[in-house]
Amino acid sequence: MKILYEGADIYPDVSVHRCYHDMYAEKQSDELLLKLNDTRELWDSWNPKKGDTIAIEDGAAKTGKMFVESVVPESGIITLRAYSVPQSAKDKRSKSWEKVKFLQLAQEIAGRHGLTLETYGITDQTYDYVEQNNLADFAFFQNRCTLEGAAFLVYDGKLVVYDEAYMESQQPVDTITITPANDFEYRDEGANAYGSAEAVNGGLTGTFAAPNGGDKMLRRILPFRMTDQSEADRFAKGLLRDANKNATVGTLWTGSLLRDYAAGSAVTLATEGVKSWDGTAFISRIRHDYVKTRSKLYLRKPLEGY
């Protein structure tokens, strides 16, 4: 295992008490929680500060470059928290664009925060007018992604933007067999899912109905003008996906560190006790516990047809 602090491996000089790395497929920055026993009182001499870079490596499992948010010493224990987005991500700003493309927004935000852009399955839509009104860049971009059925994550200096349905349909990276002895929990609230959605603003009302959906309708009034009917319908579809995608979720602790797994990918589940879960599951979050060398998967069943 390596702990690379500002590029230097400090692992030989510290004793690691706890090390969690949470990777999120959407809506939240990856987070590192590191607790060190600083019995040799070396930490203070290294002069750590907010914004420093840190990375954990254990074979194929890597946190990528992360940015220190806080370092708290207490009774010989150093508690460090770091995130995959830089400090600049907190800055709020206001700006407007005309005749702007989706990926133009993504590229501009990535560049502003020193990130490179990667995309998967994205349709580069064009908007007549877009306004960012006193919002942090990633909060603003998240709102736009939700409307388009897209999501993004930040990992190792990259802004990765993807179409959710596209990623859910990709070839699973592995098969996980779940037995009654596994620590597997699940929740199915599919009966409470919305069957259709409306996106409303001014004279336009976008609509979308889920395949085999029920009568329950989601209605959202959007605080901005939509370009045309096709855009309004597309936004209704994105809103319905966002409201329903976590209807069936589960968590699974594994007995080992899943070094090759990452949030935003799919796996195949083969279960002995919960056959309804057999098939593809999307990893919405994964926690790597580097001290106990095990992982916790947060899974959701992909939506069908949208």
What are these regions (language model features)?
Residues 16, 29-31, 63, 75-77, ...:
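Extracytoplasmic
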Residues 34, 94-117, 132-156, 199, ...:
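Amphipathic, non-transmembrane alpha-helical segments in extracytoplasmic/periplasmic proteins
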Residues 77-78, 84-85, 121-190:
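Short beta-strand-centered interaction patches in the first periplasmic/extracellular domains
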Residues 95-100, 299-306:
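Glycine- and charge-enriched low-complexity intrinsically disordered segments
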